[in-house]
């Protein structure tokens, strides 16, 4: 009897210890994603409902989101990362990856990828795509938009319906854009003009050779033909763009907000009251749902100014996902990405919601949106996670457009600086000073202040900050990179 009691007591103790251990083993892991934009009621309902249930069921994971408004995203992101707040994954522009690495905002991902990603991910994000997220051979970011990319930052996405309504059919030059804005101002005064100063597409229009931005922010450009770096503010193209934009302001074609709230340009365009915004390949399809919600008659179309000029492939897309050093669960972040891109169903679920409720595919594999949210912005940003393996088009997108889209890069020229990342070691103070001086340059570029009155002093301040030494170092590193 005593032996039996001892056995029972022992089993009781084992079970007592085992239950919390089993509970702990089954507890879901958590990650936190820093995400740009406003959290809508629809997004909250999705994240707390169908999305939460699916990732818990399939990943045993809870995914938290911290939203930052577009106008504050970059400044607040830097503050949060510097304060080592518990963020596991965040988005930024791929051209700024080297800056983030220099600021110690992005940790190496090679070991995490090897541990957390299945072999199948090499087909979803191939080697050629992943190479764009490497600096000195180390993977610091995931180039998250896998799609054709030549002519990046050089498109203008405009209201084609309004263009035709005022008697025009297409635009090819900056003067065509100006004429469009003037006609709308005269004939359709209820519209508020352009949503964006589009300084990069305008640079394509005015520059003698095509420029690609390199190093930190907008300080330096790389000449695709001369294969040298230049201070953008010192180029003739800068002066031409600034003077063009100044005329647009003086003629009442630009509203003050396009300069003082530059980062809200996409939000403005989606109100249905504006004429154009900087585009990207496919942007007309990407934002048309939101624009049509505001103006059901809206039709969008993308244009390249000076279309006869060459197009360059200078990056593997424009978006990058990074894991900060302070991430509490970096493995969880990588597991989540592998899950999201693991199948077309998961991918479309994240973008558009529940199949059969928010969206479906017709017999031809075309996207059919069923809910107002799916017809508008969707849930996860399509442009941020776009993947050519899974991308679908709605039935109103022509077969001709899809073929053009798929073969867009066929005639493009790979840039000599493709894969280059500037290392600012030893130049951190100069870079910071130049970016501070750029705050005086930017209003000139946007046309918000008079060129002749402000340009000489702003240029002198930029030079005093060390822009010439900075450009010389960029050129030194570029020469070494291109010599490999």
Task: List where the protein language model places each region.
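Positively charged n-region of N-terminal signal peptides that target proteins for export
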Residues: 1-8
């Amino acid at each position: 009897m005593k032996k039996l009691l001892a056995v029972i007591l022992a089993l009781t103790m084992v079970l007592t210890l085992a239950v919390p251990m089993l509970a702990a083993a089954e507890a879901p892991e958590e990650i936190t994603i820093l995400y740009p934009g406003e959290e809508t009621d629809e997004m909250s309902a999705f994240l707390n409902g169908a999305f939460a249930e699916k990732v818990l069921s399939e990943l045993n994971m809870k995914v938290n989101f911290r939203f930052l408004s577009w106008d504050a995203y970059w400044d607040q992101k830097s503050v949060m990362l510097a304060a080592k707040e518990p963020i596991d994954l965040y988005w930024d522009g791929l051209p700024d990856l080297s800056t983030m690495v220099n600021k110690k905002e992005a940790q190496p991902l090679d070991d995490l990828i090897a541990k957390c990603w299945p072999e199948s991910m090499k087909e979803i994000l191939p080697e050629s795509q992943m190479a764009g997220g490497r600096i000195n051979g180390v993977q610091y970011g995931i180039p998250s938009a896998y799609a054709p990319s030549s002519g990046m930052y050089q498109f203008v996405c405009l209201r084609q319906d309004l263009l035709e309504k005022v008697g025009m059919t297409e635009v090819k030059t900056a003067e065509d854009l100006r004429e469009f804005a003037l006609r709308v101002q005269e004939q359709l005064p209820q519209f508020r003009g352009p949503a964006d100063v589009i300084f990069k597409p305008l640079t394509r229009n005015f520059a003698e050779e095509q420029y690609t931005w390199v190093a930190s922010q907008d300080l330096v450009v790389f000449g695709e033909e001369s294969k040298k770096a230049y201070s953008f503010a010192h180029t003739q193209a800068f002066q031409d763009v600034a003077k063009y934009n100044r005329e647009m302001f003086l003629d009442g074609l630009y509203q003050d907000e396009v300069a003082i709230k530059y980062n809200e340009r996409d939000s403005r365009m989606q109100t249905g009251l504006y004429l154009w915004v900087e585009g990207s390949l496919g942007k007309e399809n990407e934002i048309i749902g939101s624009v049509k919600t505001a103006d059901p008659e809206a039709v969008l179309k993308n244009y390249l100014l000076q279309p006869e000029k060459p197009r360059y492939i200078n990056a593997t897309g424009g978006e990058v996902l990074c894991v900060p050093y302070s991430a509490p669960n970096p493995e969880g972040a990588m597991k989540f990405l592998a899950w999201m891109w693991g199948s077309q169903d998961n991918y479309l679920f994240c973008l558009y919601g529940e199949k059969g409720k928010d969206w479906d595919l017709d017999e031809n594999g075309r996207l059919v949106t069923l809910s107002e949210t799916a017809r508008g912005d969707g849930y996860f940003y399509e442009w941020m996670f776009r993947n050519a393996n899974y991308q679908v088009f709605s039935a109103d997108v022509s077969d001709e457009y899809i073929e053009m889209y798929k073969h867009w890069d066929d005639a493009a020229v790979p840039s000599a600086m493709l894969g280059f990342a500037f290392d600012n070691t030893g130049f951190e103070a100069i870079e910071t000073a130049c970016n501070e001086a750029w705050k005086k340059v930017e209003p000139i570029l946007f046309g918000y202040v008079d060129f002749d009155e402000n340009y000489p002093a702003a240029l002198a301040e930029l030079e005093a900050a060390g822009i010439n030494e900075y450009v010389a170092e960029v050129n030194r590193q570029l020469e070494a990179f291109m010599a490999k």
